[in-house]
Amino acid sequence: MIKKASLLTACSVTAFSAWAQDTSPDTLVVTAIRFEQPRSTVLAPTTVVTRQDIDRWQSTSVNDVLRRLPGVDITQNGGSGQLSSIFIRGTNASHVLVLIDGVRLNLAGVSGSADLSQFPIALVQRIEYIRGPRSAVYGSDAIGGVVNIITTRDEPGTEISAGWGSNSYQNYDVSTQQQLGDKTRVTLLGDYAHTHGYDVVAYGNTGTQAQTDNDGFLSKTLYGALEHNFTDAWSGFVRGYGYDNRTNYDAYYSPGSPLLDTRKLYSQSWDAGLRYNGELIKSQLITSYSHSKDYNYDPHYGRYDSSATLDEMKQYTVQWANNVIVGHGSIGAGVDWQKQTTTPGTGYVEDGYDQRNTGIYLTGLQQVGDFTFEGAARSDDNSQFGRHGTWQTSAGWEFIEGYRFIASYGTSYKAPNLGQLYGFYGNPNLDPEKSKQWEGAFEGLTAGVNWRISGYRNDVSDLIYYDDHTLKYYNEGKARIKGVEATANFDTGPLTHTVSYDYVDARNAITDTPLLRRAKQQVKYQLDWQLYDFDWGITYQYLGTRYDKDYSSYPYQTVKMGGVSLWDLAVAYPVTSHLTVRGKIANLFDKDYETVYGYQTAGREYTLSGSYTF
């Protein structure tokens, strides 16, 4: 289960006094400042998901993991592999920065937002999730929050697993990590997942031809990593992974034209790095390369037919980051460089393009008595829109032992994507979308309950929108988002409880109308316990009302979508110390609901799996 540590420990061993909870060590995170620090020293709300959590929940997709977390609202055009969006605290899907091992997800470069329905869950060993602005550390996209998916495996050994389930779901996975001498270790993984799916039935959205077929998903994944410790302080690594996905979906049909209802995605990523981990100084230099090819085509004609579309992007990055322990805290500085290139036709842009971005940043964290101060500033120089600066600052006050008040303010931005700049309807004069955010929070430990309550406001300006009359994109939109987030976890005897509540009022600041596809309220509850060696888990999620557009007729009408309560039940049993069997029922009461208007969800689903470790 997710545990929130509340020991106010230091960047060094003696820097911070204890902040009363349990005696377990404080969880270390790397996403906030790009280097390890105790989670309790991160003033922004931070959640960590481990591989053990994912196995306990028996999640078969990254979206199933993220939907359980505070502030996250997932929408999807159907089942596995179908187009999905992540909304964090009411911001746009394009306002979420997704990192893979600290490197920006390549697929987000074309559309402007990350679709994690395509990313293999088998690669995920850990997720670090931070709410609030982080552009002052990472640059573009980090308005609503940052999701950092970490693929590095910590435990040596070999695991073989297999699973089966509803809609002909099947999954086979083999992974191993082995030591080669005292200083070198190698990790390998292979994964195969397939489901026939079901008919997502996009009512009225498929044109004049009904598509009563199953919309399935197939994914094949390979991963490899080599790590070596040269000395106690110096280490290096080389890592690579790739996946080959095929998705069938319901597409819009025009008589006499090919029906582009199949997606084929190839993606590969490679990175290498050198790290220095001294007592006072830490430094790392990391380079990466990724290449994605995303086809949409009619299977009767093939993906190389002239009717098919291809989005192809290559991304190159170099990151140099440094962190120095100073007093009761640290100062960090770094520079990162990114280059993205596309082939002609990508993002409906006739010519290929080349975009470069160089960012320099400074971070600081310091403890002064009962106060904790955190700050960051960054300047980006982009080949398309020039220079842009962001900054953020936070302060925490432990006014009573075990209780803390936190206040923060930050600016962030989102760069225009390829299609908005250079597409047929593009505008090369677009500016970045800009955000100003305020947050106040109380957190503490009361009678064994570890809790946090936050209130926030986010004003987003220069939002890019499409004008139906001029057929162009412009920076004229504004959004005003207000929200409250409450989280708590506690134990009652053998039962472990994790609960969160989100209230989000996300509105168009010009028309005062609700932003589409955001649930106004969410309640999430996780209950875990062990009984006679059986590990049980119950997940509850309430999704409140939301609004969407009915695109089946013009002019498009706004529709209100009702709320729903969902229950999952999971159980695991260790047959031996090496063999574990698991079973799960998702959507236990078979609720009929939609998160995108016109696209059905799966209903009740069953899965059965087993894993053998040695």
Swiss-Prot record:
Database matches in SUPFAM superfamilies: Porins
InterPro entries xrefs: B12_transptr_BtuB, Plug_dom, Plug_dom_sf, TonB-dep_rcpt-like, TonB-dep_rcpt_b-brl, TonB_rcpt_b-brl_sf, TonB_rcpt_CS
PROSITE patterns: TONB_DEPENDENT_REC_2, TONB_DEPENDENT_REC_3
Compartment(s) of residence: Cell outer membrane
Binding site for cyanocob(III)alamin: 83, 85, 92, 110-111, 251, 309, 517, 551
Protein origin, superkingdom: Bacteria
Transmembrane segments: 158-165, 169-178, 184-195, 217-227, 232-248, 263-277, 279-296, 309-325, 328-337, 353-369, 371-381, 385-400, 403-417, 434-443, 449-458, 473-490, 494-509, 517-529, 535-550, 558-572, 585-596, 602-614
Range of residues in the leader sequence: 1-20
The entry's keywords: Calcium, Cell outer membrane, Ion transport, Membrane, Metal-binding, Porin, Signal, TonB box, Transmembrane, Transmembrane beta strand, Transport
BP GO annotations: monoatomic ion transport
Binding residues annotated for Ca(2+) 2, in chain numbering: 213, 215, 249-250, 261
GO cellular component, one term: pore complex
Molecular-function GO term, any one: porin activity
Main location: membrane
CDD domains reported in the protein's UniProt record: ligand_gated_channel (cd01347)
Domain TBDR plug: 38-152
Annotated residues for binding of Ca(2+) 1: 199, 211, 213, 215, 250
Ranges spanned by the short sequence motif TonB box, renumbered to the chain: 26-33
Membrane topology listed for this record: Multi-pass membrane protein
HAMAP family, alphabetized: BtuB (MF_01531)
Protein name per UniProt: Vitamin B12 transporter BtuB
Origin species: Shigella flexneri serotype 5b (strain 8401)
